[in-house]
């Protein structure tokens, strides 16, 4: 499946909740959910119905995929890796998604959205343990130090994102030095540290276990 390049706010409307895909816009009155909280499309207002069974599992998977901006193939690979790990598969899956470099940069406040954080990583602005890393899907481990490269410390996008997210504290599992544009992963994220939206990862496990 190709990456979605249409209007981002349609994805939130399709899931019926804020997925926080547009940074500061999601916290303003311009948010599409605030203005048109119904399924997009000509007959969107008339299509509301109770979803059960497979449909509920599918919507939960799509919701998480959209939050983290991953393709179906990437998502399935992440699930298969989580299934091989010790512990609860659903929690392993969410933890691995949260440990992606683009997600960590977003959590540190150096991107107002995961999409912007992904762009920051791809453009080569980030070092991991002193070495440049431009792979958004790279998994970050406990003890890893993430820094904005010296040549990028005056980057307008990063500085603007840092200022825009000053009101949002970093999660407990990341120690962030906002002025120094760096941070360190202190522990693995716990279930309560994960995404801002309400979700049931067990439905995803049931979907892929069929």
Curated annotation (Swiss-Prot):
Protein's name in the database: Small ribosomal subunit protein uS4
Protein's UniProt keywords contain rRNA-binding: yes
CDD domains: S4 (cd00165)
Function in brief: One of the primary rRNA binding proteins, it binds directly to 16S rRNA where it nucleates assembly of the body of the 30S subunit. With S5 and S12 plays an important role in translational accuracy.
Family matches, as HAMAP family: Ribosomal_uS4_B (MF_01306_B)
PANTHER family reported for this sequence: 30S 40S RIBOSOMAL PROTEIN, SMALL RIBOSOMAL SUBUNIT PROTEIN US4M
SMART domains in alphabetical order: Ribosomal_S4, S4
Subunit structure: Part of the 30S ribosomal subunit. Contacts protein S5. The interaction surface between S4 and S5 is involved in control of translational fidelity.
Family affiliation: Belongs to the universal ribosomal protein uS4 family.
GO MF assignments: rRNA binding; structural constituent of ribosome
Record Pfam families: Ribosomal_S4, S4
InterPro entries: Ribosomal_uS4, Ribosomal_uS4_bac-type, Ribosomal_uS4_CS, Ribosomal_uS4_N, S4_RNA-bd, S4_RNA-bd_sf
Keywords of this entry: Ribonucleoprotein, Ribosomal protein, RNA-binding, rRNA-binding
GO biological process, one term: translation
Cellular component aspect of the GO annotation: small ribosomal subunit
Boundaries of every S4 RNA-binding domain copy: 99-161
């Amino acid at each position: 499946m190709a990456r979605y390049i249409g209007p981002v706010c349609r994805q939130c409307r399709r899931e019926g909740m804020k997925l926080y895909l547009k940074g500061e816009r999601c916290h303003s009155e311009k948010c599409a959910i605030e203005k048109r909280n119904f399924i997009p499309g000509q007959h969107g207002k008339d299509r509301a119905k109770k979803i059960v069974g497979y449909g509920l599992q599918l919507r939960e998977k799509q919701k998480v995929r959209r939050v983290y901006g991953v393709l179906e193939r990437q998502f399935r690979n992440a699930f298969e890796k989580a299934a091989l790990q010790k512990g609860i598969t659903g929690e392993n899956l969410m933890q691995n998604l949260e440990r992606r470099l683009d997600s960590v940069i977003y959590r540190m406040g150096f991107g107002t959205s995961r999409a912007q954080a992904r762009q920051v990583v791809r453009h080569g602005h980030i070092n991991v343990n002193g070495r440049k890393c431009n792979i958004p899907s790279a998994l970050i481990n406990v003890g890893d130090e993430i820094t904005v490269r010296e040549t990028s410390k005056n980057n307008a996008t990063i500085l603007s994102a840092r200022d825009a997210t000053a009101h949002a504290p970093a999660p407990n599992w990341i120690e962030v030095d906002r002025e120094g544009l760096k941070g360190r992963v202190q522990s693995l994220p716990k279930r309560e540290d994960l995404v801002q939206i309400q979700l049931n990862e067990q439905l995803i496990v049931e979907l892929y276990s069929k």
